[in-house]
Amino acid sequence: MEHLNKKEEICRKVAESFRFAGKITKMSPYGSGHINDTFMLTCELEDGSNKHYILQRMNDDIFRNPKELMENVVNVTTFLRKKIIAAGGDPERETLNIILTKDGASYLQDETGDYWRSYVFIDDATCFDLVEKPEDFYNSAVAFGHFQQLLADYPAATLHETIKNFHNTVDRFHNFLKAVEEDVVGRAKDVQAEIEFVKAREADCHIICDALANGEIPLRVTHNDTKINNVLIDAATGKGICVIDLDTVMPGLSAYDFGDSIRTGANDCAEDEPDQSKVHFDLHLYEVFAKGYLSTAGASMSPAEKKSLAWGAKLMTLECGIRFLTDYLEGDHYFHTARPDHNLDRARTQFTLVRQMEEVFDQMLEIVS
């Protein structure tokens, strides 16, 4: 509790530097995120009503350049706000709104060197951690597709690449080969089947990257963390209203965002399921998501880019499995593990999903065409 009070004390001091409306009457830890320290602030306005804000300490161990990160967030949200207003929407609820410091900056560096930023809290909205019913997955797809559509004419190349080669599957494959060759903890001999599974799909790793290099698909502004809980759902309508957590917004491909949503949402198992007989790729949920995503993003996409979405589903799943297996071979240094072979179980789950996607891949292509 002392540690929590210390955090709140620091947070209160930091809050004095931001342009909040009204007087701060309450401050409490908020959410279950593991990367940033997040607090909700309640401010009482002159008319007696309350306004809520989010105040966050950014984790610069993960995001090494908070300045570039916040430049991306400011530029993208400013662009989105203009688009939403032009379309007659509600910019206070349909995009994140940054609260500036009293010096007019988008973030604050405190006396200890930590970086802080603040957003207006969007009231009367919620989010889901899991796909509980197809309608939820559809609504998240509509929201992510709308996000892509609004940013279709944003100059993606002008954004900072805040995490280098984040979804470069070719680079991930090369890192994997290096881990196999060095075999620093002597595990390679026990996972030959998994190693051969990845090696057999080397050509697949190049497909999306080559399509971009050849000009077949465009560079886009991508979210890069398209889990269902990064869409706020309006409490009254049940519809997705706002895409949140823009820390990984940077140049990328629509296939990345589409594919990561499918990887995390179109199955009925835990990411670290040790029993592979319980792992099932759900083609129906894939179709539900594709329908929602294309209903909003499809108008700005060429046939080649739509086709790349199916490849994105397979390759984001394969890439994630490669990362888990690479970490396992290197001694479990990157991903937190709770048991022996935890990363191996994670890798096997992703590879099982890839196999099942391959069995229905023609249907996956047809659905997005």
Regions found by a protein language model. Name each.
Residues 1-28:
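Juxta-kinase regulatory segment immediately upstream of eukaryotic protein kinase catalytic domains
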Residues 26-30, 34-44, 49-178, 252-254, ...:
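Conserved ATP-binding subdomain of kinase catalytic cores across diverse folds
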Residues 245:
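Conserved active-site aspartate in kinases
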Residues 306-316:
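Small/polar glycine-rich anion-binding or flexible loop at a beta-alpha turn
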Residues 357-360:
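Long, compositionally biased intrinsically disordered regions
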